Amino acid sequence: MFDEEELERQLRRADPATTPSNAPPSVRAEADLRRITTGAAAKKSPQRRHRWLALPALGALLVLAFFLVQQVLPSNVGGNPTAIAATPPVLTGTGTPREFAVFVKEAAAKLRDQEPETPIREASYESWNVNTDFNADGSTFSYVSPQEVTTTWRADLSGEITVVTGTPYLPEGSITPDTAPTPAGAIVREERFIAGEMGIVFAAEPPTDAAAMSAYLTEYGGIEDPNDPAQVLEAVGQLLSEWTLSGAEHSALLESLAEVPGFESIGSVTDRLGRAGLGFSAQSPTDPRFHSILVLDATTGEILSMEKVYLGGVPEFSFDPPTVTSYIAWK
């Protein structure tokens, strides 16, 4: 049996980017949770070689699922239920929509010769979690607390992760007062991993060919159906959270996405970091409870961010659809 220290170490190996207990599950963890609850997890390919399918990873998933339930179910303070689902506003598009396949193919041609020339084992991104503080009178104060994550790793699977709090803001978008309990710039996690300890999913270097990229995402990214855009985006999100792709690799990634059906334009949007982009929604044919939003740079077509939106159908959730349940914006 594991003692507490060994159990914690194994959970970190399974999910090295896990943030403190009030953080939401990652895009990857949400995908795994949905596959387990819908029964899709049983459809395993015998050729897969995923580190994250090991028993410690399942334990980490169950822990993350517990924290998800803690965040979305009502809290009981003084006998009065208080919803704590303060989330960012849903992205809305404007202007003339662009056809997804046409736009990404045009962007792929532009990106192929762009820097960097070689991939970098590093990723920097902003994600978010919900915080709720309980006052002495039983009232609550909910706010969105972004986190800035930097992951650096090496071929021997050693590396570092640093998590810094961003500027907290209220659900309607205004900045919280200076008295907000989570100040911007505070380091909430700083950890180093020795060789072999970092649980990187896409350890192999990404390919520069579109067909090879599709196979790469399917093999390492846990994709059950390559024609399910939501599943594909979950794998893409994991990849971009581990690598800074070369221009040729990013081009191949976009070309591979052009072959995936189900993307619909929502028009011009501004992502969570204030960047101009084009938004495309993707609905899984097997899970109508959520849809994904992919934001591409309006000029270059580079992938800027992704969001997950709850559409309804989960009675236990305490918030009304549509509600953003997670976002990640790469820098």
Predicted feature residues:
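N-terminal export/targeting signals for secretion/compartment entry
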Residues: 1-92
